[in-house]
Amino acid sequence: MAKDKKFVEDITPMDEDFAQWYTDIVKKAELADYSSIRGCMIIRPNGYAIWENIQKYVDTKLKEYGHENVSMPIFIPENLLQKEKDHVEGFAPEVAWVTHGGDDELAERLCVRPTSETLFCEHYAKIVQSYKDLPKLYNQWCSVVRWEKTTRPFLRTTEFLWQEGHTIHETKEEAESHSLKILNMYSRLCEDMLAMPVVMGKKTDKEKFAGADDTYTIESLMHDGKALQAGTSHYLGQNFSKAFAIQFSDRNGKLDYPHYTTWAVTTRLIGAIIMVHGDNSGLKLPPRIAPTQAVIIPVAQHKEGVLEKAEELKERLAKVVRVKLDDSDKMPGWKYSEYEMKGIPLRIEIGPKDIEKNQAVLVRRDNREKTIVSLDEIEIKVQEMLDIIHNSMLEEAKKTRDEKTYVATNMEEFEDTIENKPGFIKAMWCGDKACEDKIREVTGATSRCMPFEQEVVSDTCVCCGKKAKNLVYWGRAY
């Protein structure tokens, strides 16, 4: 029992060592484990089930929008990768190469896909001839490999799971609109499912995707004041279409190049959930994404009728929520701590006295508040409580983000804020890359995005003092 208790309680306080706190939760909540390959992880059932719920939401939305799922090869020939100059230069340092098949050296190196634009372009060039073939709306669920120097489970790994969408369109307007439609869907995923507020905006040219005309992003803020890029959507213009000779006959019979979009979310969203919502007791899962939304804990389960009533309750609730019954012989107190640590949104306690009174006790993971409900209406009450928990978690995350969002009007304010009050910094920018580079060099902060909702917090650039063009969210980031 002592060992069990230590397993539950031994989580490093986040204020003491945030990185170790994060690692403790990943391991103790059984989300992932380290593999024997540096930078690669084993996603355990608890972690993968969260990803499956993210998949379900995104896949359903994409199919509503008319997308189709496909599967592309894991390997890309070197000559294919070289076709788009900016793209290959952007990914070259992270590429893993296959040079041998068995004992035989390959005639041409094969890249293990870091992303699949080149493969989709090669395919689209073969199947598109006319404007009547457009748009092509493809998506794939797969893993990709990027040889990262510094890794951390879910946040930055050598191999990770994602969905990558690749679409081509007849016009620039249609493609740009589609890019923003997907970004908005990602925003809804974060807020409606993950209870995680985001800032929507456009990346600067320095931070945009290699080979893109425009990159749109959703940025979130973690407990420790660092930013995390939660999802991106790119408008690639005609750059890739021209590089790969994708052409179609337009409505006037003239040849033209389609406009390309690509976009993705990854398993780093699981890391974001941990760092936005978690506390010193462990993981705290938003109800709509939680693999198990409620756990039933029988109290004094050795007494007559308790387990039978708990089983009956499970059968009833299983029709409306994802529920688990823990009828193991561990003490109730240990179970409470374990499921708090694993982030189950709602605990349902039922014992002999509750059965006598035809009631159960609901305990929220987010604030530990207890509510007594009648067994006659428990299905409705549990569903209502899960919605209340989601809304409460979202509002709490918004409050934390807003409290850690600051304004700086000059470099002295910027440096003081980034060192002493980690978070988002709203500051004006002149548009000059040299200022962006200097801010990063001096403070370690990068431009996170130029928010769609622009405001003027100063007339001059925070760095050089010249006339400002855009409000930018800045921050140190994962």
UniProtKB/Swiss-Prot annotation:
Keyword Lipid metabolism: no
GO biological process: prolyl-tRNA aminoacylation
Main localization (coarse): cytoplasm
Molecular functions (GO terms): ATP binding; catalytic activity, acting on a protein; proline-tRNA ligase activity; transferase activity
Domain notes: Consists of three domains: the N-terminal catalytic domain, the anticodon-binding domain and the C-terminal extension.
Free-text function comment from the UniProt entry: Catalyzes the attachment of proline to tRNA(Pro) in a two-step reaction: proline is first activated by ATP to form Pro-AMP and then transferred to the acceptor end of tRNA(Pro).
UniProt cross-references to HAMAP family, sorted A to Z: Pro_tRNA_synth_type3
Keyword ATP-binding carried by entry: yes
Superkingdom, natural source: Bacteria
Source organism per UniProt: Clostridium botulinum (strain Okra / Type B1)
Main EC class the enzyme belongs to: ligase
Gene coding for it: proS
UniProt keywords, alphabetically: Aminoacyl-tRNA synthetase, ATP-binding, Cytoplasm, Ligase, Nucleotide-binding, Protein biosynthesis
Enzyme Commission number(s) of this protein: 6.1.1.15
Source species taxonomy: Bacteria, Bacillati, Bacillota, Clostridia, Eubacteriales
Protein family: Belongs to the class-II aminoacyl-tRNA synthetase family. ProS type 3 subfamily.
Cell compartments where the protein resides: Cytoplasm
Catalytic reaction list: tRNA(Pro) + L-proline + ATP = L-prolyl-tRNA(Pro) + AMP + diphosphate
Protein name: Proline--tRNA ligase
GO CC annotations, alphabetized: aminoacyl-tRNA synthetase multienzyme complex; cytoplasm
InterPro entries: aa-tRNA-synt_IIb (IPR002314), aa-tRNA-synth_II (IPR006195), aa-tRNA-synth_II/BPL/LPL (IPR045864), Anticodon-bd (IPR004154), Anticodon-bd_dom_sf (IPR036621), Pro-tRNA-ligase_IIa (IPR002316), Pro-tRNA-ligase_IIa_arc-type (IPR004499), Pro-tRNA_ligase_II_C (IPR016061)
Oligomeric form and interacting partners: Homodimer.
